[in-house]
């Protein structure tokens, strides 16, 4: 399904929160939407492997990496795992790497930057916690919609049809 965040903001202005324009699209899917699972981890993506091994149909992994752009939390292997398990997308308040490979995958991926240095894989972090960045507070179960224009968040699913 294709999402137009500008149109959704026009229709649901009172029901959505707009994330500050910090993010760029790195995935092969220009728009995506779904229910979020929140993760908080800093320069360590071990927990992301565990979560992306789960069925992701209709879900988006929302990663609070503390805004660090020193180490990439998402790489091509993690993105392929997400795609294999039918995740709709990944939003990272942090960095990604292997950008050329990410662009080839039919997966929504938004992050604040790219860097070639990979993250540690110790599994340090927590999931299903409240996270806050970009002027918005996110909870697991909220609904996120993203495209090349921006990212919006709604407590309940929006009627897109």
Curated annotation (Swiss-Prot):
<protein>
    <recommendedName>
        <fullName>Regulator of ribonuclease activity A</fullName>
    </recommendedName>
</protein>
<dbReference type="GO" id="GO:0060698">
    <property type="term" value="F:endoribonuclease inhibitor activity"/>
</dbReference>
<dbReference type="GO" id="GO:0019899">
    <property type="term" value="F:enzyme binding"/>
</dbReference>
<dbReference type="InterPro" id="IPR036704">
    <property type="entry name" value="RraA/RraA-like_sf"/>
</dbReference>
<keyword id="KW-0963">Cytoplasm</keyword>
<dbReference type="Pfam" id="PF03737">
    <property type="entry name" value="RraA-like"/>
</dbReference>
<comment type="subunit">
    <text>Homotrimer. Binds to both RNA-binding sites in the C-terminal region of Rne and to RhlB.</text>
</comment>
<comment type="function">
    <text>Globally modulates RNA abundance by binding to RNase E (Rne) and regulating its endonucleolytic activity. Can modulate Rne action in a substrate-dependent manner by altering the composition of the degradosome. Modulates RNA-binding and helicase activities of the degradosome.</text>
</comment>
<dbReference type="InterPro" id="IPR010203">
    <property type="entry name" value="RraA"/>
</dbReference>
<dbReference type="GO" id="GO:0005829">
    <property type="term" value="C:cytosol"/>
</dbReference>
<dbReference type="InterPro" id="IPR005493">
    <property type="entry name" value="RraA/RraA-like"/>
</dbReference>
<dbReference type="InterPro" id="IPR014339">
    <property type="entry name" value="RraA_gpbac"/>
</dbReference>
<dbReference type="GO" id="GO:1902369">
    <property type="term" value="P:negative regulation of RNA catabolic process"/>
</dbReference>
<comment type="similarity">
    <text>Belongs to the RraA family.</text>
</comment>
